[in-house]
Amino acid sequence: SFRHFGTTKAGTPVDIIEEVADADVRVGLGNVEYHYFAGYSGGAKAIMPGCSTFEAIQANHSLMLSPEAHAGNMESPVRLDLEEACRMVGLDFIVNVVLDEDRHIVYAAAGDFVAAQRDACHHLDDLYGCELHEEADIVVVSQGGAPKDLNLYQLQKALDNAKHPVRDGGTIVLVGSCQEGFGQPTFEQWMREAVTPHEVVKRLKKTFVLGGHKAAAVAQIEERCDIYLVSDMPDAEVRAAFMTPFATVQEALDAARAKTLRELGRAPRMLVMPHGGSNVPLMRF
């Protein structure tokens, strides 16, 4: 059963499992990595969503449609809502770590659940963040290869990181095997049932559904730029996801270059992200 602590300003019910609510001391453990709408993981997430109800998670995650809810933003409205909920419950101490690509601990921060988490975030930025001072016309991005790109649901993480540096009207060349297709039933259903990407976003605004939330995250990107997908997915499935299928990266790149030249009358500015699931462009302009 759960204990009710109140409601956040954003309307998230703070309902926490009784064993945690009744504890004399609460200590949170976790790792800090980029999160595509909470900004970063770690910190307050040990309590919310870690020890909360499905309804609370849905309410908090519905804030993901805010323009400020993106990877690399320590003040994401999703993050701030989590921390407000955590203050209502109380989290006495945390230990948050940063991992390298081989899952080895390279940094640890401990103490207050906000201050220690922010400390770990800054260290994560030093390792995996990349400062950029202008947008690109074309971004070529890969999740980093198997087993991180088995389906489109997984590939969404790299796609979301690539959205930051691409200009409005630009092109993202997304590369991944996607041999398992869409990879998640609700994600696939929402894509197939929509006529336009905007319909997917509107659907999530009306009713938040896990799985559908990733479809909406992809659709938001598709509303502002083109996505060329180089994968093993059948062309019809790629088009059902509102993307353009290509057999090779070279073919996709040639098409993206031609599009830029046609629309802007100049050679494109390009960015390549071979480990797009791990690296986040930090836009500084």
Regions found by a protein language model. Give the residues of each.
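Short helix/loop capping segments that flank catalytic or ligand/cofactor-binding pockets
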Residues: 29, 35-38, 56-59, 104, ...
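Membrane-embedded hairpin module used as a gating/binding unit in multi-pass transport
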Residues: 69-146
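C-terminal non-catalytic interaction/assembly regions of soluble proteins
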Residues: 155-156, 160-285
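Structural motif
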Residues: 27-29, 138-142, 173, 271-272
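An acidic, phosphate/nucleotide-engaging active-site surface
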Residues: 1-40
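A generic local secondary-structure boundary/capping motif
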Residues: 14-23, 35-36, 48, 82-86, ...
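Mobile "lid/hinge" segments at catalytic clefts and subdomain interfaces of large enzymes
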Residues: 32-33, 41-95
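Short, glycine-rich nucleotide/cofactor-binding loops
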Residues: 144-154
